[in-house]
């Protein structure tokens, strides 16, 4: 049996707006075809379930989409660590989890698409040499389709 300790972290309002502003600025200055890595989105191991600590990043993306009504994106999922194909299609399921979050929060699905790339587009060669490299390969990106 595993127990989880809930830790409440209070983030000052001005810090939250800085994070949102940063993502919003990235989106505003992005051109069609640009890729933006969504840092700090984590999933349960071999699962499309987003861990609760990742919610802040999802809400930042939601705000960026609400602030840019003409913005259309493709959500791209990537996995790490395996040279074999993504047999469980986890990368697609993770990208879809982000898509579902946005649709459930009233973003028009016509503005969104999603795709999984498995291990086909790593940042670092596989197998990774460090956990940091694995974390960078295990990511969600958004590609600007229209802005």
Model feature map: region roles:
Residues 49, 53, 78-147:
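Periplasmic OmpA-like peptidoglycan-binding domain that tethers envelope proteins to the cell wall
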């Amino acid at each position: 049996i595993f127990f989880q300790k809930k830790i409440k972290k209070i983030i000052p309002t001005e810090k939250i707006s800085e994070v949102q502003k940063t993502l919003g600025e990235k989106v505003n200055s992005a051109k069609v075809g640009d890729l933006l890595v969504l840092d700090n989105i984590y999933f349960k191991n071999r699962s499309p379930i987003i861990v609760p600590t990742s919610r802040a990043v999802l809400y930042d993306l939601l705000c960026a989409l609400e602030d840019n009504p003409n913005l259309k994106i493709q959500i791209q999922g990537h996995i790490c660590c395996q040279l074999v194909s993504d047999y469980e299609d986890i990368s697609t399921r993770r990208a879809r989890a982000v898509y579902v979050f946005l649709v459930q929060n009233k973003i028009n699905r016509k503005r969104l698409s999603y795709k999984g790339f498995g291990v086909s587009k790593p940042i670092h060669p596989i197998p990774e040499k460090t956990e940091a490299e694995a974390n960078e390969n295990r990511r969600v990106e958004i590609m600007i389709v229209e802005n």
